[in-house]
């Protein structure tokens, strides 16, 4: 009984990891596209600002 439960829980965890790595499509709304692009710009600009400080 315990072995079966352990096996099923392990398989469930592995399947979750496998399917959770799929890329989710961005929302079709304009707000989603704008917020996504601004987030990428913020991350890139913060990375560029840190490089000269070193």
UniProtKB/Swiss-Prot annotation:
Expressed in retina (at protein level). GO terms for biological process: visual perception. It is a lipid-anchor. The keyword Cell inner membrane does not apply. Palmitoylated at Cys-2. Palmitoylation is essential for protein stability and trafficking to the photoreceptor outer segment, but does not appear to be essential for membrane localization. Probably palmitoylated by ZDHHC3. Residues 35-46 have a biased composition (Polar residues). It is found in: Cell projection, Cilium, Photoreceptor outer segment; Membrane; Endoplasmic reticulum; Golgi apparatus. Keywords: Cell projection, Endoplasmic reticulum, Golgi apparatus, Lipoprotein, Membrane, Palmitate, Phosphoprotein, Sensory transduction, Vision. Residues 24-54 are annotated as: Disordered. One of its GO terms (cellular component) is extracellular region. A lipid is attached at residue 2 (S-palmitoyl cysteine). One of its GO terms (molecular function) is opsin binding. Involved in vision. Belongs to the PRCD family. Interacts with RHO/rhodopsin; the interaction promotes PRCD stability. This is Photoreceptor disk component PRCD. It comes from Bos taurus (Bovine).
């Amino acid at each position: 009984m315990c072995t079966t439960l352990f096996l099923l829980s392990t398989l469930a965890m592995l399947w979750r990891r496998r399917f959770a790595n799929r890329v989710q499509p961005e929302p079709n709304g304009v707000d989603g596209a704008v917020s996504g692009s601004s987030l990428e710009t913020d991350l890139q600009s913060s990375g560029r600002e840190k490089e000269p400080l070193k």
